[in-house]
Amino acid sequence: VFRSAGFAEISRYFSARVPLKETTGPTPPETDGLDVDEWDGSDPEALFRQVFALSRRASRNNAFYKPISEVAFLARYMPVVPMMKRELILFARRSDGSLAGFLFGIPNYAEGPNPKSAILKTYASLEPGAGRLLAYGFHKAAFRLGYENAIHALIHDNNTSANRSAAEGATIFRRYTLLGRKLNG
């Protein structure tokens, strides 16, 4: 219907599922000076201020990135804090303590009050290898918390994360196509 109305494919994405028992293999190669830690659950506003600053830098070259103010960013994310599980919020920090990457995971609340899946929702990094360390840490934490599966959500088909998800044995269960159309005038 949309294509017949002049819309064309702009980008393709997918979501995939992987049993967590299959992702807890060998630790990724060490990345000099990076440590991955879980969020301690304190000061969520400070957490999101750091995430905002890193996100701006890590995302600025993404095709659909549109800058927003820190105030707007905080207004968007602070309401979800009560739904967050601190053990699924991870940070990669350099030896000087500065933030090199972050990962947000959430329980799959669509499965009801006792979800069996955790969703690797968003991650961004500024250092090579940080994303891989964060994903590994997420899988370990989710497995430790009793989740059976991880969902790698909304991954661009041509992103490094797509290759990593496939290498971990994830099976695609949903595909998405972003359509667009140039408007006249």
Predicted regions: what is each one?
Residues 1-23, 79-81, 87-90, 95, ...:
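Active-site/acyl-donor-binding loops of N-acyltransferases
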Residues 28-69, 99-100, 185:
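Short amphipathic alpha-helix that is part of the acyltransferase structural core
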Residues 43, 73, 109:
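Short, catalytically relevant binding-site loops at active-site mouths
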Residues 67-82:
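Beta-rich nucleic-acid/ligand-interaction surfaces
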Residues 56, 60, 78, 82-85:
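Generic surface-pattern signal
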